[in-house]
């Protein structure tokens, strides 16, 4: 399990004074596997860092299928950008795939911290920058790499995802069926 300080330092080290401001307003919560942390029908007013556990972000397509498009592990963060930016329910669901320990912070409190503490504002910028970069990489990979190449890249860069996340969610994340993923895995 990762400490809040360890997670913050992973992204952007901050002073003890700034960390104390953040830590005082953060609550550690435990949630069970299969908990829907963010529901597309509800506004979620919290931001979470994952201290322990895994999660996925998914949407429901027009045929009623769940389509996973982000997979999370420890040190990642959970946030509904619709909720954060527009204070409205998001279009996505975030489900825990393992029992989890999360650090929870109210979004409005986080925004006030950003306004009053430059180090925390810079931390927020780094989080947003890294999210934008990762999103762009996934998009470009989907456009330019074969399914086999996407799987090999995931295996090389994030072997823990392959070990811990169910294959049906990995297949969905890669944009392929579980049968196709099984074929790819048998050839590697």
Predicted segment positions?
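Cyclic-nucleotide recognition modules
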Residues: 68-126
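Glycine- and acidic-residue-biased ligand/ion/polar-headgroup-sensing regions
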Residues: 34, 45, 49-56, 75
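His/acidic/aromatic-lined binding-pocket segments of jelly-roll/cupin-type domains
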Residues: 28-29, 45-50, 69-70, 173
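Short, Lys/Arg-enriched N-terminal segment that forms or immediately precedes the first helix
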Residues: 131-140
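A generic structural motif
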Residues: 58-60, 97
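Phosphate-/nucleic-acid-contacting segments
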Residues: 145-188
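Short phosphate-coordinating micro-motif centered on Lys-Gly-acidic
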Residues: 37-42
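Cyclic nucleotide-binding regulatory module and flanking cytosolic helices
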Residues: 1-27, 83
């Amino acid at each position: 399990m990762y400490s809040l300080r360890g997670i913050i330092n992973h992204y952007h080290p901050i002073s003890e004074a700034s960390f104390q401001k953040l830590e005082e307003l953060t609550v550690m919560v435990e949630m069970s596997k299969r908990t829907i942390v963010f529901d597309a029908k509800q506004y979620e007013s919290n931001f979470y860092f994952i201290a322990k556990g895994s999660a996925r972000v998914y949407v429901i397509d027009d045929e009623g299928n769940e389509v996973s498009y982000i997979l999370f592990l420890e040190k990642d963060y959970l946030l509904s950008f619709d909720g954060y930016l527009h204070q409205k329910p998001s279009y996505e669901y975030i489900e825990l795939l393992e029992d989890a320990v999360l650090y929870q912070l109210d979004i409005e409190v986080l925004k006030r911290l950003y306004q009053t503490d430059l180090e925390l504002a810079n931390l927020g910028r780094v989080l947003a920058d890294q999210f934008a970069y990762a999103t762009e990489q996934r998009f470009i990979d989907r456009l330019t790499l074969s399914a086999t190449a996407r799987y090999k890249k995931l295996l090389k860069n994030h072997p823990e995802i392959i070990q811990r996340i169910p294959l049906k969610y990995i297949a969905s994340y890669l944009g392929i069926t579980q049968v196709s993923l099984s074929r790819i895995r048998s050839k590697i």
